[in-house]
Amino acid sequence: MPTVYFEDLQIGSVFLGRECVCDKEEMLEFGRRNDPWPFHVDEDAAARSPFGGVIASGGYIVTLWYRSLIEIYNTERASWAFLGGLEWHLRFRAPLRPAETLRAKLTVKDKRPWFTPDRGAVMLYSEVLKLQGEVVCTVDATVLLATRRGSGLGTTAVAGAEVH
């Protein structure tokens, strides 16, 4: 499987993750275990809430976002050379309801060499989108990726994720 290194990513590149469905039972169970507000776990109470029905917890939305990103970061086509995340800034824009489908859209906003030559910082902007185009959540993230030098490879890797 090819590896995507710091040098392989181009500013402005856009990647689309796989579609993920908000499964009602999974969403409710996540809410019961992790975020038990009535509008996440109780359909009757949620119907009387400002949301007019049960909605996904922000934590569950982040889980689906990450599932969608796996299509970009780590598939049989390519694996990104992640060393770690430095920071995330999340903004929730719209509720996610059962049976709605979403996918992640990831844009490389900027990249900079790190303090050591074996890695680089990549600034990413991600939108979690419903299929109709409504933005559920946005994420600004800065991550560290290995360089080819840091991996010990001197050859150019082929980026395998689908670019749109």
Q: How would you describe each model-predicted region?
A:
Residues 1-10, 95-164:
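HotDog/MaoC-like acyl-thioester-processing domains
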Residues 1-87, 150-164:
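Hot-dog-fold acyl-thioester-processing enzymes
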Residues 86-89, 108-110:
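Acidic, glycine-rich active-site loops and adjacent beta-strand->loop/helix elements
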Residues 19, 65, 92, 106-108:
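Conserved hydrophobic positions within beta-strands
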